[in-house]
C-alpha cells in the first residue's frame, strides 16, 4: 500500500490521490484541477518523472497557482524518494542529481516565499542500501515502510499545526 494511503489510515484523515501514473509533471492543467478542489491541505509528489528543465520551467507557476487558490491551506511538496546517486547507471545518476539540485533550489526559495508551502527535503528517505526498490526507481514494501517513517511524522506535524488531526 502506498505511503500516503497508509498515513491516511494512521492519522484518520482522508487523502484523495490524483495519481497520473508518474506522468503528472506540474502541467498547468494539473494545477487547475488541484486549484478547483475543496481541500484542507495538498501533498504533492510531482517530481518523480520530471526533468531538471521541466522543474525549472514549471514549478514556480504551479506553486503560485496552488497558493492563489488555497492561500490558507498547507501545500506540502516531497522530492523523489529514491536516491539514484547510488545507482550503477551513471547517466541516470547524473540526471537525477541535476534534477535534485534544481528541485532543492527552487522549492527552498518557494517555501521561503509562501508561508503555507513546505518542502520536505529528506535525504535517503528510502535508505542507501538499494534494498528499498525493485529497480532503483520504484519503491517496494520496504521502501514504502521507510518513506512512511521518514515523511509521516513531518506531514502529521504540519497538518496538526493547522488543526488537521
Segment roles from a protein language model:
Residues 34-44, 71-72:
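Proline-aspartate-enriched helix->loop->beta-strand connector
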Residues 59-64, 104-107:
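Generic structural signal for well-ordered alpha-helices
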Residues 134-165:
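Histidine-centered active-site loop/cap adjacent to the catalytic His
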Residues 21-27, 49-56:
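Acidic-and-aromatic substrate-binding clefts and catalytic sites of carbohydrate-active enzymes
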Residues 1-20, 28-35:
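Serine-esterase "nucleophile elbow" of acetyl-processing enzymes
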Residues 83-121, 146, 165:
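Substrate-gating cap/lid alpha-helix
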Residues 45-54, 90-98, 134-142:
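The substrate-binding groove and active-site-proximal loops of carbohydrate-active enzymes
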Amino acid at each position: 500500500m502506498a505511503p500516503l494511503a497508509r498515513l491516511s489510515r494512521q492519522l484518520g484523515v482522508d487523502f484523495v490521490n490524483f495519481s497520473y501514473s508518474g506522468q503528472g509533471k506540474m502541467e498547468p492543467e494539473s494545477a487547475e484541477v488541484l486549484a478547483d478542489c475543496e481541500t484542507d491541505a495538498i501533498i504533492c509528489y510531482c517530481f518523480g518523472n520530471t526533468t531538471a528543465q521541466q522543474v525549472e520551467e514549471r514549478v514556480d507557476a504551479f506553486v503560485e497557482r496552488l497558493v492563489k487558490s488555497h492561500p490558507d491551506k498547507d501545500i506540502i511538496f516531497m522530492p523523489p524518494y529514491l536516491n539514484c546517486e547510488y545507482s550503477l547507471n551513471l547517466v541516470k545518476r547524473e540526471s537525477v542529481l541535476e534534477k535534485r539540485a534544481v528541485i532543492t533550489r527552487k522549492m527552498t526559495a518557494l517555501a521561503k516565499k509562501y508561508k503555507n508551502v513546505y518542502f520536505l527535503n529528506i535525504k535517503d528517505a528510502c535508505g542507501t542500501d538499494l534494498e528499498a526498490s525493485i529497480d532503483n526507481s520504484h519503491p517496494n514494501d520496504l521502501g514504502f515502510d521507510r518513506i512512511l517513517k521518514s515523511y509521516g511524522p513531518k506531514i502529521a506535524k504540519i497538518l496538526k499545526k493547522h488543526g488537521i488531526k
